[in-house]
């Protein structure tokens, strides 16, 4: 069965190596380097999800029950040193507990806890609103109260025992390590020395040892004793945590050897002081050890660019600072919250980000899709290390080779020049001289005529200067706009002026008066005509609607006709 498990592990490891190699090979690093894009070999990705908890109870003063009070004065002096170290820490913990309350739903029956609701409610008394730091501190207090009963039992047992190390487990299986680092020295050396060397000499040896222990205590836990916040534990503190044997971490933490190396290298094991007991001179630390999970088949590459030349012009390719490659995915990686070890990136979540399609195709080797910008200043990098050598743009830079500082002439048909230990031992770029790695090799394979994508503008924008320019432009535009409005009000808008309106009113009044005068004149003229020609004096030839036969009767017409007859 054991052989089968080992065989399965070997097969899975081989498949992981093959998959990682395939993922790495999908990025043509040699082709990209010809246009100044430098991509490293990449590191694996691990997600730091949950964590394991440990508690360290440090007994800082050994149990000295020597004859005739031998060594008592030295212990009192040692305690005064500890008071200066621990009293500010105790006061800060008291203040934190006064500001933050943690309500636990706990009922007890005959001293036995029946139920526990871990960190149910975290509120504030003095501050009103809980900040993220207060919530973190509240959770730490909740955890401390959960383990308080177990830690109290250990403290009690430590005062009654003369053992230097006690390793127990609490009710939830978390380890509590009790350390009495000076007890072995007292038991093995001080007590026998009293009968051989006398009390005074033994007391002096004890005083020297206490001073040395205080110095070692500050070395191992100095950063943790200086604050009530989380601080990384040193290797010395980890050795104390694991019985002075750092390799025992591999057997006590449920993780692999590479994960242990990563958390130690990146200082991700955190310790927080949660209790200070000045009566017994004991300090309790809560230790968080992250559990890492590796994401298979994923590599995070660090990418950068230097300028390159095409037809005598200097260009620059824009690429994301980090590239995440997966079997069927290629994108960017946001490593803001990640920590980097020698072999991996440790992130609290998946850092993958989408990038434009043109950048994806560019990173995959299609240089015609690479977004580029024209270089107009000297701030763009001109060289970089790659494969143990140097890749440099020697058209835009002054490059020398060898101890004789021989100038390097770059072919204008090539974007960059590759300098290694084989063709140039001492490399100089713009006055900076460096030696190439002897194991480096020439990376000029695949050099060919290159074409790149359309130019884009990526020059950084000074927002303050641009805002000032925009404000000045708006002020000038406002003045010009007022001038334009004034001109427009004078051109084509004559009927809106006050003088024009008054003139129109006067003309209309004059016209109205003339019309009235004409009507009156006509009326008087007609009336005078009627008064000068009454109806009985109308001449015969005057046109009238009355028949002329009426005039014949009235004017004696018939009488004249009768006489003629």
From Swiss-Prot:
GO biological process entries: fusion of virus membrane with host plasma membrane; symbiont entry into host cell
Q: Where are the transmembrane segments?
A: 501-521
Site note Cleavage, residues: 116-117
Q: Which Gene3D superfamilies match?
A: 1.10.287.2480, Head and neck region of the ectodomain of NDV fusion glycoprotein, Newcastle disease virus like domain
Signal peptide from the UniProt entry: 1-25
Q: Which Pfam families match?
A: Fusion_gly (PF00523)
Coiled-coil zones: 142-170, 466-491
- Note down the stretches annotated as region Fusion peptide: 117-141
Disulfide bond entries: 70-199, 338-347, 362-370, 394-399, 401-424
- The question of whether Zinc-finger is a record keyword is answered with no
Compartment annotation: Virion membrane; Host cell membrane
Q: Give glycosylation sites per the record.
A: 104, 245, 449
This protein's GO CC annotations: host cell plasma membrane; membrane; viral envelope; virion membrane
The way this protein sits in the membrane is described as: Single-pass type I membrane protein; Single-pass membrane protein
Q: Give me the Extracellular side stretches, as residue ranges.
A: 26-500
Q: What is its main location?
A: virion
Q: Which InterPro entries match?
A: Fusion_F0_Paramyxovir (IPR000776)
Kindly indicate whether the keyword Metal-binding belongs to this entry.
no
Q: Where is this region: Leucine-zipper?
A: 269-307
Q: What else is known?
A: Sendai virus or recombinant F protein are widely used in cellular biology to fuse cells.
Q: Identify its protein family.
A: Belongs to the paramyxoviruses fusion glycoprotein family.
Can you state the subunit structure given in the record? Homotrimer of disulfide-linked F1-F2. Interacts with HN and M proteins.
Function, as annotated:
Class I viral fusion protein. Under the current model, the protein has at least 3 conformational states: pre-fusion native state, pre-hairpin intermediate state, and post-fusion hairpin state. During viral and plasma cell membrane fusion, the heptad repeat (HR) regions assume a trimer-of-hairpins structure, positioning the fusion peptide in close proximity to the C-terminal region of the ectodomain. The formation of this structure appears to drive apposition and subsequent fusion of viral and plasma cell membranes.
Notes concerning its domains: The cytoplasmic region mediates the interaction with HN and M proteins.
State what protein this is by name.
Fusion glycoprotein F0
Q: Which organism is it from?
A: Sendai virus (strain Fushimi) (SeV)
- The gene is F
């Amino acid at each position: 069965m054991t052989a089968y498990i080992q065989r399965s592990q070997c097969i899975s490891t081989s498949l992981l190596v093959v998959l990682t190699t395939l993922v790495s090979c999908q990025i043509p690093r040699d082709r990209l380097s010809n246009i100044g894009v430098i991509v490293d070999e990449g590191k694996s990705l691990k997600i730091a999800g949950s964590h394991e908890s440990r508690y360290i109870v440090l007994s800082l003063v050994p149990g000295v029950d020597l004859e005739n009070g031998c060594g008592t004065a030295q212990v009192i002096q040692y305690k005064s040193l500890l008071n200066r170290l621990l009293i500010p820490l105790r006061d800060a913990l008291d203040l934190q507990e006064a500001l933050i309350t943690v309500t636990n739903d706990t009922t007890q029956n005959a001293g036995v806890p029946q139920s526990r609701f871990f960190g149910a409610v975290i509120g504030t008394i003095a501050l009103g609103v809980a900040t993220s730091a207060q919530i973190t501190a509240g959770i730490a207090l909740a955890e401390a109260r959960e383990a308080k009963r177990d830690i109290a039992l250990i403290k009690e047992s430590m005062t009654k025992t003369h053992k230097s190390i006690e390793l127990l487990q609490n009710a939830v299986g978390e380890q509590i390590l009790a350390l009495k680092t000076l007890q072995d020295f007292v038991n093995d050396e001080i007590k026998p020395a009293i009968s051989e060397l006398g009390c005074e000499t033994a007391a002096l040896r004890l005083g020297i040892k206490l001073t040395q222990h205080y110095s070692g205590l500050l070395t191992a836990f100095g950063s943790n004793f200086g604050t009530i916040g989380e601080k990384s534990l040193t290797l010395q503190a980890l050795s104390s945590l694991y019985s002075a044997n750092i390799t025992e971490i591999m057997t006590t933490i449920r993780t692999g050897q590479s994960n242990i190396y990563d958390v130690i290298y990146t200082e991700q094991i955190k310790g927080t002081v949660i209790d200070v007991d000045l009566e017994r001179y004991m300090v309790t630390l809560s230790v968080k050890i992250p559990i890492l999970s590796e994401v298979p088949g994923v590599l995070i590459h660090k990418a950068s660019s230097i300028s390159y030349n095409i037809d005598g012009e200097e260009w620059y390719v824009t690429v994301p600072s980090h590239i995440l490659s997966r079997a069927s995915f290629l994108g960017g990686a946001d490593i803001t919250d990640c920590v980097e070890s020698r072999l991996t990136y440790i992130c609290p979540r998946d850092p993958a980000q989408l990038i434009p399609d043109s950048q994806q195709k560019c990173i995959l080797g299609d240089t015609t899709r690479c977004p580029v910008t024209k270089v107009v200043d000297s701030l763009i990098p001109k060289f970089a290390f790659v494969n143990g050598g140097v890749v440099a743009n020697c058209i835009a830079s002054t490059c020398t080779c060898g101890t004789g500082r021989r100038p390097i002439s770059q072919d204008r048909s090539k974007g960059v020049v590759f300098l290694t230990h084989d063709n140039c031992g001492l490399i100089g770029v713009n006055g900076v001289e460096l030696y190439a790695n002897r194991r480096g090799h020439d990376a000029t394979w695949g050099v060919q005529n290159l074409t790149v994508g359309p130019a884009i503008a990526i020059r950084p924008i000074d927002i303050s200067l641009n805002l000032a320019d925009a404000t000045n432009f708006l002020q000038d535009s406002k003045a010009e706009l007022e001038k334009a409005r004034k001109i427009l009000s004078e051109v084509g808008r004559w009927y809106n002026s006050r003088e024009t309106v008054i003139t129109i009113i006067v003309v209309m009044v004059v016209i109205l008066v003339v019309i009235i005068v004409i009507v009156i004149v006509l009326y008087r003229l007609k009336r005078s005509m009627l008064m000068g020609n009454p109806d009985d004096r109308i001449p015969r030839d005057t046109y009238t609607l009355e028949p002329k036969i009426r005039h014949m009767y009235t004017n004696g017409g018939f009488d004249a006709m009768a006489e003629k007859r």
